[in-house]
């Protein structure tokens, strides 16, 4: 978990999906982000990339080749690398890996 802060807010970010985990008001300690109650929905603020929603039959065609892509894409389920962290900013990167290359394989 990585944290950045200002006089107003403190934000905690997970490397898993580069997902925000907490946004806390510095003045009163109030959590302003959904808490991720697992009985309802355990995620908080997932990065939906490269698509928001569901594709017809979970497929898309590019250059006459069909590919499979599940609802909301893949970024939210992969590990991001923290590239830069300062008091007021954090930069994460999703790097090519066997998992990302598998996503790009043609649907047969």
Please provide the spans of the model-predicted regions:
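Surface-exposed acidic/polar loop and edge beta-strand patches at domain peripheries
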Residues: 1-105
